Amino acid sequence: GEVPLTCMELSKGEEKKQLIFLQRHHNHGAPSRPPHMIEHRANIRALFDAGCEGVMAVCSVGAIPEDFPPGKVALADQYIDFTGHQSTFHDDAALFTSVTDPFDSELNAALEAVLRTAQDFDAKERMRYTYWLAQGPHFETKAEIDAIDTLGGHMVGMTMPREVKLARELNLPYAAVCISSNWAAGREPGNASQDLDHHSVSSQANRRLAPVWACMLHLLTM
């Protein structure tokens, strides 16, 4: 189907840059599309066909380690996807894409510097984490989060790795800015039985957009 893109042109003196915004949960005016129903192939292909030179994804995640509290904004440098969901443009021909390092190193380095400055973090602050892809649309159980922690996941979400796989197939540089919007199930300090609420999660993410804007503005000057 059609993919709605918002195109903007920013200028500074004689220099002009174009920014294309895509809401991954777009649903043609209806309520947001649930994560397991997002048409990732259409979204990434639309960005590629629009001539994007790179992608800065913004993700709301549930955090597992103590050094990634709600409100902190960091980066993904690896992902783990055991969902069994296929994300590829190559359904007919056997083509195999390397994702040893799935995220663009140049973009991540630039964004890490911006995020440190925007949040007053020193050089010791950890800024890169492993994203665990959950099937969704349900949040995880405490037992699932414990297992994810054991297997090396630091944050959980329901979308992003499906995008970066497709971007890699198109050689489209991709970075993921991740907003810790909540503690993952069972990790709320002092209340391991705290229920997760979608609206509270979204509200926390929306309150932490300033570092995200700083990243975007920096990329437009690169």
Give short role names for the model-derived ranges:
Residues 48-51, 149, 168:
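Non-catalytic positions within long, well-ordered alpha-helices that form the structural scaffold/packing
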Residues 1-99:
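Metabolite-binding pocket within alpha/beta catalytic cores that recognizes anionic/polar moieties
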Residues 44, 145, 161-164:
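Generic hydrophobic/aromatic pocket-lining and core-packing "Φ" positions
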Residues 31-36, 132-136, 153:
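Short, flexible loop segments at the rims of nucleotide/cofactor-binding pockets, characterized by
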Residues 158-198:
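Zn-dependent metallopeptidase/amidohydrolase metal-coordination segment
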Residues 58-145, 150:
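Mid-sequence, gly/pro-rich, charge-dense loop/helix-turn segments that line enzyme active sites
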Residues 53-54, 154, 173:
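Short acidic/polar active-site loop segments enriched in Thr and Asp
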Residues 184-222:
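His/Asp/Glu-rich mid-to-C-terminal helical/loop segments that flank catalytic regions of hydrolases
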